[in-house]
Amino acid sequence: MKYITVLGSTGSIGTQTLEIVRELPNKFKVVALSAGRNIDLLTEQVSQHKPEVIAIDDENLLTDLKNNINNLGISNPPIVLGGREAINSVAAWDSADTVITGIVGCAGLIPTMSAIKASKNIALANKETLIAAGSVVIPALKENKSRLLPADSEHSAIFQCIQGLPNYENADFVTGQIPNGLKAIHLTASGGAFRDWAVEDLKNVTVEDATSHPNWSMGRKITVDSATLMNKGLEVIEAHYLFGTPYQNIEIVIHPQSIIHSMIEMEDSSVLAQLGWPDMKLPILYAMSWPERFRTNWKRFNLTEIGQLTFKKPDEVKYPCMGLAYSAGKCSGTMPAVLNAANEMAVDQFLKEKISFQEIPTFINKTCEAHINKLNLNPNLEDILEVDNWARIFVQEEIKKGKKYINVE
């Protein structure tokens, strides 16, 4: 039995994690949950899973949440906490051995660090933690003897493929050390909502268009990131930190079927790939169950049903966010945190219909350019949080100016 904490339990990753727990009740027990604002769903989750402690990020909802829990009438009700510090306490909850981090965006960084400092195993679905603060997170993992297991499909695929390399049992998969025999990583991308659109048609994109993914069921923010290909660009930075691979050896390839979740190329030129249906529960389960494989009743893989697998090179003009991510990763230091924060704010403003879809990379690029002269190559956690806040404010101020900028390559 594994005892788990789910951070962001009412979001897409959190709800899918709890579906897995319901399907495998003899393998997992939920001991702690955290959510942002959805107290009704959190109350329902408490009724089903009966955790020891829960936390809501919005302290203004704490009284209502406590009333909801009292009205459940369950024996041994959970401790109910509120606020950011409460989320951190839940992340480090003593009886949990594995923490699933499903909080969207950089908001998941501090809770993840709390879990690492408590020496928990981390099932990381919050890629922003490594993107913004990989240079801080990786040493913290080593220092606290905490293991980080990727819970997103691409990095889970790489993680699984690496176990086919020589001496894999001795490889430090997730602390930035290049596994023996690994030459390159090929990250697959669906191409997002606009993979079949002409570049000139992107000026007409609506929020509804951008939040409809052809293959995956995901939250709104990450679905927009998929449409801009920023999601894949961020995953390049994440792969660099997880597996120690140089940026020039990490390639993005469009794979519309989303069946091959990523590939690794070895020093002898052979390639290993991990295949499966496009279902986020697969990588989440593996991060939770590793090093074991638990039997499920999920749909079995069928190559003849798929019919064909196709690949193509991504269009750099169509997907400028991809190049911005590579550039920020190569700059290192605080630049990835600035990129991530600017993207989060730009996407938020797009979802609120304050800017157009094509302005997302424009404002990200402007923010990164403004940070070049302030780049810190050896940041601590406080430095990262400071530039994260700066970048968000900068994007908002630039949008308020109402100016249009041309992306500078």
UniProtKB/Swiss-Prot annotation:
The protein's required cofactors: Mg(2+); Mn(2+)
Keyword vocabulary terms for this entry: Isoprene biosynthesis, Manganese, Metal-binding, NADP, Oxidoreductase
Entry binding sites for Mn(2+): 152, 154, 235
Entry-linked Gene3D superfamilies: 1.10.1740.10, NAD(P)-binding Rossmann-like Domain (3.40.50.720)
InterPro entries, per the entry: DXP_reductoisomerase, DXP_reductoisomerase_C, DXP_reductoisomerase_N, DXPR_C, DXPR_C_sf, NAD(P)-bd_dom_sf
Superkingdom assignment: Bacteria
HAMAP family, per the entry: DXP_reductoisom (MF_00183)
PANTHER family associated with the record: 1-DEOXY-D-XYLULOSE 5-PHOSPHATE REDUCTOISOMERASE, 1-DEOXY-D-XYLULOSE 5-PHOSPHATE REDUCTOISOMERASE, CHLOROPLASTIC
Function of the molecule: Catalyzes the NADPH-dependent rearrangement and reduction of 1-deoxy-D-xylulose-5-phosphate (DXP) to 2-C-methyl-D-erythritol 4-phosphate (MEP).
Protein name per the record: 1-deoxy-D-xylulose 5-phosphate reductoisomerase
